[in-house]
Swiss-Prot record:
Function: Bifunctional enzyme that catalyzes the oxidative decarboxylation of UDP-glucuronic acid (UDP-GlcUA) to UDP-4-keto-arabinose (UDP-Ara4O) and the addition of a formyl group to UDP-4-amino-4-deoxy-L-arabinose (UDP-L-Ara4N) to form UDP-L-4-formamido-arabinose (UDP-L-Ara4FN). The modified arabinose is attached to lipid A and is required for resistance to polymyxin and cationic antimicrobial peptides.
SUPFAM superfamilies given in the database record: FMT C-terminal domain-like, Formyltransferase, NAD(P)-binding Rossmann-fold domains
Binding site for (6R)-10-formyltetrahydrofolate: H86, L87, I88, R114, V136, K137, R138, A139, D140
Lineage: Bacteria, Pseudomonadati, Pseudomonadota, Gammaproteobacteria, Enterobacterales
Family stated for the protein in its record: In the N-terminal section; belongs to the Fmt family. UDP-L-Ara4N formyltransferase subfamily.
A GO-annotated cellular component: membrane
Protein name in UniProt: Bifunctional polymyxin resistance protein ArnA
Organism per entry: Shigella sonnei (strain Ss046)
Listed EC numbers: 2.1.2.13, 1.1.1.305
Keywords, alphabetical: Antibiotic resistance, Lipid A biosynthesis, Lipid biosynthesis, Lipid metabolism, Lipopolysaccharide biosynthesis, Multifunctional enzyme, NAD, Oxidoreductase, Transferase
Encoding gene per record: arnA
Pfam families: Epimerase, Formyl_trans_C, Formyl_trans_N
Amino acid sequence: MKTVVFAYHDMGCLGIEALLAAGYEISAIFTHTDNPAEKAFYGSVARLAAERGIPVYAPDNVNHPLWVERIAQLSPEVIFSFYYRHLICDEILQLAPAGAFNLHGSLLPKYRGRAPLNWVLVNGETETGVTLHRMVKRADAGAIVAQLRVAIAPDDIAITLHHKLCHAARQLLEQTLPAIKHGNILEIAQRENEATCFGHRTPDDSFLEWHKPASVLHNMVRAVADPWPGAFSYVGNQKFTVWSSRVHPHASKAQPGSVISVAPLLIACGDGALEIVTGQAGDGITMQGSQLAQMLGLVQGSRLNSQPACTARRRTRVLILGVNGFIGNHLTERLLREDHYEVYGLDIGSDAISRFLNHPHFHFVEGDISIHSEWIEYHVKKCDVVLPLVAIATPIEYTRNPLRVFELDFEENLRIIRYCVKYRKRIIFPSTSEVYGMCSDKYFDEDHSNLIVGPVNKPRWIYSVSKQLLDRVIWAYGEKEGLQFTLFRPFNWMGPRLDNLNAARIGSSRAITQLILNLVEGSPIKLIDGGKQKRCFTDIRDGIEALYRIIENAGNRCDGEIINIGNPENEASIEELGEMLLASFEKHPLRHHFPPFAGFRVVESSSYYGKGYQDVEHRKPSIRNARRCLDWEPKIDMQETIDETLDFFLRTVDLTDKPS
């Protein structure tokens, strides 16, 4: 049976050996180049492939159309993935008639995502396992073909558990691969209500927070012990690594992080005490705890800390242009919730951000980006991250004021982009789902979908092409001049503070705001061309969490990426949106203050938007880049978003002159 294999690490090697032992014909193997910053304690898939005479490749992006075509030419009957680190696109998965199967290091649906080996130890689990499952578009979500349980002993650390999982994986594959070969497998769907998902871990995630219980810190030490980077702490500015530890039920009134004794080296925790059995100062050698205490100059009563004592982290300065807008004000709230951001904002109004004006880490200037160019250039130079969120983004304006859309959305933003290039600042640019235009793909993909717009005499597309050209300019600056950038494409974000009812009164608002105004005023809900156009609606909280993770940029994974941010599960037509909104309105406690529902009315787009308008029938995002770069999934159901958005707007209405 012909197969193409995607593999890395020890699991990749044993998976390849198991396939060969089971009589599979491996046409090609795809793997990764080794990261020089990573301690390579595991087997080399590339070396194994070379020794076995199998073609092996390590492309940066295996999902590129050229690689998809090359894999198609191999005509695989089945595809296997053994610890390959990138998501494989649906186009590749569909190439194998017998399907694609992935080996995952947990008992799915628990511990989907990255680093399950480490996470089960961090969380103090007593059991894990390996799962072979069918691959689908969503990571680790396909039907289970086989599982094998593995007990986690109290003295297991990451490497011993890794060896146990490898042994279990060999057994699992020996039992299961012949059945797959003969088409004789029983698949069990995963229970979504039991699913848990965990993200990528970095060495910086393993600092010891002494206010936590000793058992929790001991589990952290176990989870990242050698050959992983190790759990760490600081004495003053001196970093040290803890390689092994023991939990002591020591009752002490000492502050967490205090040294209780140096022989043994015992540290007070939020609950109990942690004995540091072995450790290492800086880049030195491993030594026992009491010697480490001597090396670090510790005495009874000394204090350890999770961060260097004199290097308080400078807050990251974020410049948000259009800070009073829908995305800007919600993003400001999310950033200020953390203690390491300083937000600088500019906008022509401040009603949505009034709640932040007295915050010590929020700095606001009221002004227009077309006028305050010197202020903007100064703050681009001063800040670390720039988000130019100013744009005209309401469809009626595309036909009503196309030149103003071009001047603001393109020309003003191009100037800001050039400032970022000049001062070498990171830019996070709001592209738009509109750039996909009339694309016919089932899922709009950032890296593969064509961007299709209408003729020049349809000014409705001026917003789309302005944004698209800026995307291309930013990409070119990144390629040619090293601009650090991320492009994000929101798909129909909704929530409180989206537009306002006054904007809806002049037709310059998004769909849901216009529909709410119709309900508030007792006017018919207008369904443009019947309202059959489908969109994927995304809760603002989900969207902002993804955007926050782009700003955080863990491991620089977002650099040079284009990321759709939308909820493909929340697809509905505008008509269905209106019906859901109406149902929510009818049961709202303030309903009796408003006129009776005036019904739905179908209108032609030309009579509503004017000459030059074209609509898009569907717009559904692929979110594989968001999953890969951000470890992000949208979580909030559309009905909840509708209820909260409606409630917000109804409570802004002056009810003194409304019927009761």
